């Protein structure tokens, strides 16, 4: 209940004045109704921000065949509904302990979900589907690291961990069996994120060329400008970048 979160907030602030309190809310937290009550998460004294499940849903929707326009609309809705400080402190997730592994979700079809529990427990993507899933996961990570918010990696996703629902998504880290190319890709994204302050606090603008399989947006701050383009389609796409 709100009263508990308020007490938790006050206790955390007494211990550490700049404590950050992130809530686990799967939906739009600005108008969340739970147990027949509208929650007051962002009205002061409760949550500083929340886990960005709407971003996760938008990423998977886009990479699994949805349109870039729908992705942009989903994110604009969250931006309009959330206070700016909340929006820029969102916990950007692609995988969590409550979801099937990102790599699995980006590679399986409906048929695999119909397998019995034992089948799902031992399932590994075949090479052709694994290659597709890895490409999609790299695109998902680019979006995760370049949208406003703090990118948060569920251990093992960066190493190519697979698994369906709990408990198959909670296996131990694959020490000695990591996908080294994927791991290097994530490390590079971490470096870029740490070096580019614009990714932390820059404005977000979706491009007019965002359409269909091409998602394009910009992060800008002062004289700094970053253009992010993600093409999930099977055809090469040219997109023009105007000079500052």
Model-predicted segments: where are they?
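Short secondary-structure junctions
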Residues: 198-209
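Short beta-strand segments
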Residues: 22-24, 92-95, 154-155, 226-231
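Carbohydrate-binding surface patches
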Residues: 207-243
